Design a protein with these regions (language model features):
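Positively charged, amphipathic and often flexible ligand-engagement surfaces
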Residues: 1-264
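Extended boundary segments
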Residues: 264, 271-274
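Short alpha-helical interface patches
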Residues: 14, 287-294
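Glycine-rich loop-to-alpha-helix module at the N-terminal edge of alpha/beta enzyme cores
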Residues: 293-302
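Polar helix-capping/helix-linker motif
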Residues: 30, 117-118, 275, 279, ...
Length: 302
């Protein structure tokens, strides 16, 4: 803070969502941090992200109204899908992300559209992060139409499609490059980052898989154009705020009680065994359930 360093809290796993927001707001609520501008990342492939953006906007509005500085939210699509799939499969949980790439792309545009207004950018400035030229053009035009050029900047990954980055920098006036830095003696911590970049370049549903053929191959261009238009056609600003995919609630289960088994042993034996899903600590109700159990331990006789 004293040296003018900008701190941005990144978002990795779904389980970090609530914790990262809580840490971010708690630190910036400290009196000596009220004038410090920091940032946080939200991943559009999580249905939870629009609601999280709205909660951050409400918090930031109060912060600015009381004399504090605004903050920054970096909007990304999300690059940890494989990890989220593994996590869900291992623990018996619902997948945290949207069911399709198109749904993620639609939510990305909805988050930008919701946040990119003069009233809201007074509290939160935006980082539009991504490599998709159609999405960058969408955000660029939306930024101009809403008159919020000074509150929205574009961000791309350093080293990926550098020719495109030069064009984006020239046309938008500014480009922030996301650069990973790691101690050479701890290079293993960068492996997951490199794997995600390889996956982005190889997966056919990702824009980067055809980026080098975009100008010369009409089919590739049409494919990406049609994907963009399909996601845009699903955009409904007035639709209800998406709810999380995971709804496990041990607290509600405890209050409702365990239903009595009414079937016979023979009937149960015909059904395949399905293990009870692990309790998900990423969910607020489950965390409260765990706290209640811990609080009851000193006086428990069982």
């Amino acid at each position: 803070r004293d040296h003018g360093t900008f701190l941005n809290l990144d978002m990795e796993d779904y389980k970090d969502l609530d914790l990262t927001i809580a840490v971010f707001t708690a630190i910036l609520d400290q009196e000596d941090m009220r004038g410090y501008e920091a940032g946080i990342v939200l991943q559009a492939y999580l249905p939870d992200s629009l609601g999280a953006m709205q909660r951050l906007q409400e918090w930031a509005a109060k912060r600015v109204a009381s004399g504090g500085s605004r903050v920054k939210v970096r909007i990304v699509k999300g690059a940890n899908l494989s990890m989220e799939k593994v996590d869900a499969e291992i623990h018996g949980w619902e997948l945290t992300t949207w069911p399709s790439k198109q749904a993620t792309d639609t939510n990305y545009k909805r988050m930008l559209s919701w946040a990119m207004t003069p009233e809201r950018t007074r509290n939160i400035r935006l980082g539009v992060a991504g490599q998709n030229l159609f999405d960058i053009a969408f955000a660029f035009e939306l930024r101009a139409a809403r008159g919020v050029e000074d509150s929205v900047e574009f961000e791309m990954l350093s080293g990926m499609a550098t020719g495109i980055q030069e064009v984006v920098r020239r046309d938008t006036g500014h480009l922030l490059l996301y650069v990973p830095v790691v101690d050479p003696h701890e290079f293993d911590v960068a492996i997951s980052y490199l794997v995600r970049r390889l996956e982005e370049n190889a997966a056919p549903e990702n824009f980067m898989s055809g980026v080098f053929d975009l100008a010369s191959n009409e089919q590739i261009f049409a494919r990406e154009r049609d994907r963009f238009l399909a996601a845009l056609s699903d955009l409904d600003p007035d639709a209800p705020v998406p709810v999380p995919n995971r709804t496990q609630n041990r607290l509600a289960e405890r209050e409702a009680g365990i239903p009595e088994e009414t079937g016979t042993v023979a009937e149960r034996a015909k059904r395949p065994f399905v293990s009870e899903a692990d309790s998900d600590p990423a969910l607020a109700a489950n965390r409260q359930w765990a706290r209640d159990i811990a609080a009851a331990i000193p006086g428990s006789t069982r």
